[in-house]
Amino acid sequence: MAAAPASIPDRARVVVIGGGIIGTSVAYHLGQLGWGPETLLLERDRLTSGTTWHAAGLMVTFGSFSETSTRMRHYTRDLYARLEAETGQSTGFAPIGLIEVAADEGRLEEYRRVAAFNRLMGTEVHEISPREIADLFPPARTDDLLAGFYMPQDGRVNPVDATMALAKGARMRGVTILEGTPVLDVLTTDGRVVGVRTAQGDIECEYVVNAAGMWARQLAERSGVTVPNQAAEHYYLLTDPIPGLDPDLPVLEDPGSYGYYRPEGDGMMIGLFEPVCAPWHVDAIPEDASFLTLPPDWERMGPYLEKAMARIPASMEVG
């Protein structure tokens, strides 16, 4: 647990609770709007703790029929591309491209509709053949695929670096960020926010942004607010080095095989999209879960992992 600050302010206009990718983004954008000196971000442990630090780091614009969601994806990609020049802190964004593949007629029809909408929204999308998929991503088995959809401007981002860049940008605009400062309660009067309570004392404020990640629901419950948010188990596998693997291959997503794939170091990251997820700690998320990893559940995930690895035959030959 991060050390508590020596002192805390007694007032802010906005208190942002949580220092993951969402909380730091909110703080950064409040700073852009001129609210920086009146904004306080409180992180219970260290920035990125919870779920941000081990996110897979995919930057995907494809997949939505929502105009709002698609515009946000475009904005986010552009933001990650320019933050380093603005802050001096890299986000790790690499526009290596992303390929969504379809192995059945139903998914192909769905993806063609998605592609048409995304093109309308300004996304660069190319429908490509199995041969072209193999050219772009040689480790993949492609003989059973019907087509792919290639977004050359998408790619990967480092979630820790991106969070730190947003935090630095927020500080540059006057936002105060305190680590080691868990919020114990949100204080209200007649249903209106008047402050937050911490172990170091109360802080008056007009607005609270609950960006507490997997703790958001239980924090909101203390104020009688329902946040429909539940942590779930998610697994990805990092293989041993694969000889000859190009580290700049595009990201490959194959929901039909329950998998997504991208190079990680000299090996491959294989993430799983299991059709039925497993909720984690439904009653309450442990307070000491800041940088927790879960032991593998081979009995539940084994069949999905085997199918996902079959898309990348070389992954079955290494550890």
List PLM regions with ranges.
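Conserved Rossmann-like nucleotide-cofactor binding loop
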Residues: I22, L47, W215
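Gly/Ala-rich phosphate-binding loop of Rossmann-like dinucleotide-binding domains
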Residues: A27, G31-Q32, G169
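Central helical "cap/lid" subdomain
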Residues: D202-P250
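Beta1/beta-strand and adjacent pyrophosphate-binding region of the FAD-binding site
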Residues: I8-I22, L40
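Dinucleotide-binding Rossmann-like beta1-alpha1 core, especially the glycine-rich loop
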Residues: G57-L136, G256-Y261, G265-G267, D288, ...
